[in-house]
Amino acid sequence: MQHITILGIESSCDETSASIIRDGRVLSNFIANQEIHEKYGGVVPELASRAHQSNIVPVVNSAIVQAGIQRHEIDAIAYTAGPGLIGALMVGSSFAKGLSISLNKPLIEAHHMKAHVLAQFIEEEGKTLPTLPFLCLTVSGGHTQIVLVEEPLNQKVIGTTIDDAAGEAFDKAAKILGLPYPGGPLIDKYAQEGDPFKFKFPISDIPGLDYSFSGLKTAVLYFVRDQIKTNPAFVEENLNDICASVQHTIVETLLAKFEKAMEQTGVKSIGIAGGVSANSLLRKRMLALSEKGCDVFVPKFEFCTDNAAMIAIYGYYMYKENHFGDLSTTPKARMEY
């Protein structure tokens, strides 16, 4: 039997990652995080690019060693071509092209957001893959999308955010509360001990299937500002309840439009993807939709945040369709879906 072995390389933001996938299954998925950004309260593009330059060679080598394969066994090299930070993308792109030349292997350009969705199609022992059509809620720091998947490579965005993404709403709310970056996971942590109904924040309801989270950020800002005028220790004394209330508002906003999309499409095979899909309440609420007769797919935590396994599985499907790139293409900070 002829195997298909893909090396995936991810460098769109602040994670340097490399993965080997063979016949749809992960042999390795190595990720190097960049903790340098924490003290700046967000990702600094120049620092991200420099860190990628330092990390990419050892990360790719580690992925190959961990997979237990030889370089000549790689059939193609898939790399993130966008969207993302252009300097960070250039590091992964340049390395992938150099490796392509040295190994004489074809290149595959991966769309970062489409790859997030395809993380659901990574094969594992005992795992059932989503049936098609598949409806996916992709939620990350920069994107919030409802995606209708007719085929793995045939994806259509039917709902998106018109301003801030859900991940931004988490991080901006966390910053207002004085929590360090990245704030989303900390809101999730403190929310575990809080009352989600203690404070009421607005749930946007713009027409159609699109989202808006900018109003929530403003509401949290004004709420905190007004409360600390009378009680300077308000945030410290009510942190768990504020976090739980903010998280409840974001997740209910996400689910309201997603359930509307389910009704409009009639699709019963559903799931989540992207970094925010690691949020405990979102996972719980999504899994509860199985009570409505849906098959619900929630990714492993390692496949939620940016990782190269999703790039490699995207490359796997592209390879099977003979969709290859070339050395002349350049990465793009913005990329049409």
How would you label these PLM feature ranges?
Residues 1-3, 110-134, 314:
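Conserved phosphate-binding catalytic cores of ATP/NTP-utilizing and phosphoryl-transfer enzymes
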Residues 3-83, 112, 116:
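N-terminal beta-alpha supersecondary unit
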Residues 15-21, 136-138, 144-148:
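Short beta-strand scaffold segments in enzyme catalytic cores
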Residues 79-105, 122-123, 280-289:
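Short Gly/Thr/Asp-enriched flexible loops that form oxyanion-binding sites at enzyme active sites
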Residues 109-110, 270, 287-311:
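Conserved phosphate-binding/catalytic loops in two-lobed NTP-binding clefts
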Residues 111, 150-193, 217-226:
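Glycine-rich phosphate-binding loop plus the immediately following alpha-helix
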Residues 116-117, 299-337:
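Glycine-rich phosphate-binding/hydrolytic loop that grips phosphoryl groups
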Residues 189-270, 279-288, 294, 319-322:
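A contiguous, well-structured pocket-lining segment that forms one wall/lid of small-molecule binding clefts
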